[in-house]
Amino acid sequence: MGSDGLQWVSRSLEHRPMTSLWRDIRHEVAAWLGSLKLAIGLFLAIAAASIAGTVIPQGESTDFYRQNYPDSGAVVWGFVTWRFIISLGLDEVYRSWWFVALLLLLATSLTICTFRRQIPMLKAAQNWKFYTEPRQLSKYALRTAIPARGTGPLAEQLRAGRYKVYQRDDLIYATKGTIGRVGPIVVHVSLLLIMAGAMIGAFGGYQTQRMTLAGDSFDIQQVEQSRLSLARPPDWTVRVNKFWIDYRPDGSVDQFHSDLSVVSPAGKELERKTISVNDPLIYDGVTMYQASWAVGAFKLRLNDSPVLTIPMQPIEAPNGQEAWGQAIPFDKDGRVALQMVTRGLQGSLMLLPFNPRTGETVREAATPARVGKPVSVLGQRLVIEELVGQTGIQIKADPGIPVVYAGFALLMVGLAMSYLSHSQVWAIYRDGQLHVAGRTNRAQIGFERELVRMVAAVQTPRPRTSDALSAAQE
């Protein structure tokens, strides 16, 4: 650039005030933030993040990811390692700073688009005016001029078509479906509500699962929370009064139930309900679902000993079915142990003596046992007093759910409103001619047919040549 060019730039900057420069910058930034391309890109990025949050287990320990997503050997998808997951925050996608930033950026984009585009379009639709000269209608592609006896018949046709008609002298303005201009605004507001509800749930809620024996209690305060959670769990506890399973005739599980009580710190029962699958207990914003079950323990009496409670552990059955078992010492020398196995809470077990040092069975066949019925094993009298069920309760608190539901309900309303066409019609009567023009924002063909039908209904027939000559002779 020569000296003349530099001098021109210098003079331009000197004569351009800083307020104007900042105004232009703000305008460009606002235009970019409110652009459709940015909004679509943000939607796609949020969708991709949500897929990652669905595929990758959330809220697990570092050891879990180190074990399931190793950084050597069989790497998942070739690049998804535990280091990759932890460094990008994919273990808590919906609470990560970048996911929150995407939501805030999308919310900003929708807000700017609403105020810069949708609201001005709504105001423009409401700020109508009469056209007074036929030439003013020439800017509309859909226009015509017909012989008529005035504007009255067309006004009647428009009212019959559910248009709101305004008349002044020989001028008409008619409109229908203005509420359709409100639809996009309602959609934007609903999306903002959904995102707000998602963020409230992410930072104000918690979710976990507890395995509890019948008769025991668990404290909501002990629920493991995310490191970014702002929620304060309640101080009441939950007592499992009873747990039982309904079985089908073939022995398969039909349904399982937990009788739960919500207990205050003072020991007062605040709420009680028997929950089952798809029938949770909801109290104080916390939902408790019946999620799983297990055989937690069994109670036995050996000869004249007191009742012993022995915990059960899940084991691998030969046929792949669920089973629980435990081995207990059965003699003083430690040469015999008794393996106890059950497949559920139906009340039956199999007892198998074996040598814990060699793993060899003491005798060939296992001894079946039933709850409450004595059985003899190697000369010892043994009674299984009870099989104690263990219930799996999923605990979830999400204060953002009502906001999300409200957002989705509003979204349905907004989408329905957006499908309504906003149609406008102008008419001017001059010198026996009715000049008509119209426009719509959607359903163009249907609007054209409607307008053609109304115009044809009010058009007066042109006089035939013979009638015109007769009139001239008279």
Curated annotation (Swiss-Prot):
Q: Which UniProt keywords apply?
A: Cell inner membrane, Cell membrane, Cytochrome c-type biogenesis, Membrane, Transmembrane, Transmembrane helix
Which GO biological process entries does UniProt record here?
cytochrome complex assembly
Would I find Heme among this entry's keywords? no
Membrane topology (UniProt): Multi-pass membrane protein
According to its record, what are the GO cellular component terms?
A: plasma membrane
Q: Where in the cell is it found?
A: Cell inner membrane
Q: Does the keyword DNA-binding apply?
A: no
Q: Which Pfam families is this protein grouped with?
A: ResB
Tell me which stretches of the chain form a coiled coil. Answer: none
**Where would you find the membrane-spanning parts of this chain?**
36-56, 96-116, 182-202
Q: Any idea what job this protein has?
A: Required during biogenesis of c-type cytochromes (cytochrome c6 and cytochrome f) at the step of heme attachment.
Q: Which family does it belong to?
A: Belongs to the Ccs1/CcsB family.
What is its quaternary makeup?
Answer: May interact with CcsA.
Q: Which PANTHER family match?
A: CYTOCHROME C BIOGENESIS PROTEIN CCS1, CHLOROPLASTIC (PTHR31566:SF0)
Protein name per its UniProtKB record: Cytochrome c biogenesis protein CcsB
